């Protein structure tokens, strides 16, 4: 009987841990959404037209020389390398 109670307690503890993790992820998602709305930016998006595909990415923090766009077969690969300057410079 004691093992049964211990197993149930483990399940309850695991459920609490997962719920806590889910709550934290929802909070972060809400903060990101509110931040985008206050900045007037939209999340990355794309749409498929009949003869073309259009994709919009937020690259505000990158300068043009930090971005690379390549095609590889039917794929479009966008990479960005952004060097942050330290406060000591």
UniProtKB/Swiss-Prot annotation:
One of its GO terms (molecular function) is unfolded protein binding. Residues 1-11, 19-39 have a biased composition (Basic and acidic residues). The keyword Transcription does not apply. Keywords: Stress response. GO terms for biological process: protein refolding; response to heat. GO terms for cellular component: cytoplasm; nucleus. Disulfide bonds: none annotated. Residues 35-89 form the sHSP domain. It comes from the Eukaryota. PROSITE patterns: SHSP (PS01031). Residues 1-55 are annotated as: Disordered. The keyword Transmembrane helix does not apply. It holds the Pfam family HSP20. Belongs to the small heat shock protein (HSP20) family. This is Heat shock protein 30A. It comes from Xenopus laevis. The gene is hsp30a.
């Amino acid at each position: 009987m004691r093992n049964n109670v211990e197993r149930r307690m483990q399940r309850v503890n695991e459920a609490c841990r997962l719920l806590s993790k889910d709550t934290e992820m929802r909070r972060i998602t809400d903060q990101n959404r509110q931040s985008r709305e206050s900045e007037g930016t939209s999340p990355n998006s794309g749409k498929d037209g009949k003869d073309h595909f259009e994709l919009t990415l937020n690259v505000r923090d990158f300068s043009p020389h930090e971005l690379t766009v390549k095609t590889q077969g039917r794929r479009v690969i966008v990479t960005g390398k952004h060097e942050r300057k330290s406060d000591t410079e």
